[in-house]
Amino acid sequence: MADEDRSVFDLPYISPAETIHYGKSEDQVIDFYLPKDQKKSLVVLIHGGYWRPEYDRKHLAPFANSLANTGWPVALVEYRRIIGNPDAALSDVINAIGEVSKKYSNLILIGHSAGGHLALVAAHEVNASAVIALAPLTNLLAAEELDLDEGAVADFLGAPASLRPELDPTRLPALSIPTTLIHGVLDLRVPIDFSRDYVALKTGPNVNYLEFENVGHFELIDPRSEIFPEISRVLTSLS
């Protein structure tokens, strides 16, 4: 089986136009990538990395900058990634969204992988207009059973997934806002059935799903990929 294309991690880092703090931790920051014309909804971008401390927001900087270059203001959120303390990550994402909502009234959440998980959960607690989840971890019980990323769920939760249903998108009610899941058939990091099963369970007028052949996990956040225009199209349809 071929490995995932991780070349997105090799793209040059692009500095934000502005960085603000929403808490005292060095991880409680938001990077802003801003277009000249800020008439569109704010995209709140949440990175993945299986909630692990070694993966931060910087690998999403090229994606954020490319969105800004197509006219979307972007808030790239960092959050604390503390082993065994999932509430720190979720509360940080919620608080960061609350911070940007002081200036922007129309927010679209985009999360990738573990960031997609956090976006789907946080959307129950914040005032967002829509969610786009890219290869999201929608089912913590299944991820735990499959031992994805060598025990990532156990490390994240510090407890069995069965004890934290409020953190599991599959076990939460369907969202009342437009929710779009996007997944690549060749994803080796988060099996595509995570999105397929979630959409089947939460079926309704607010739930949309796109899957792409010959696409893996990281192409979804690579601004050079064929998927980037599709994400821009979905954003436009939601704004």
Pin down the residues of each PLM region.
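Catalytic nucleophile-loop/oxyanion-hole region of alpha/beta-hydrolase
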Residues: 54-64, 75-106
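Short beta-strand/loop motif that positions the catalytic acidic residue
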Residues: 175, 181-183, 187
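Short, surface-exposed "cap/lid" segments of acyl-processing enzymes
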Residues: 36-39, 43-66
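Glycine-rich nucleophile elbow surrounding the catalytic serine of serine-hydrolase chemistry
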Residues: 111-121
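N-terminal cap/lid segment of alpha/beta-hydrolase-fold proteins
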Residues: 1-37
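Hydrolase active-site cap/lid region
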Residues: 121-162
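Conserved alpha/beta-hydrolase "acid-adjacent" motif
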Residues: 188-194
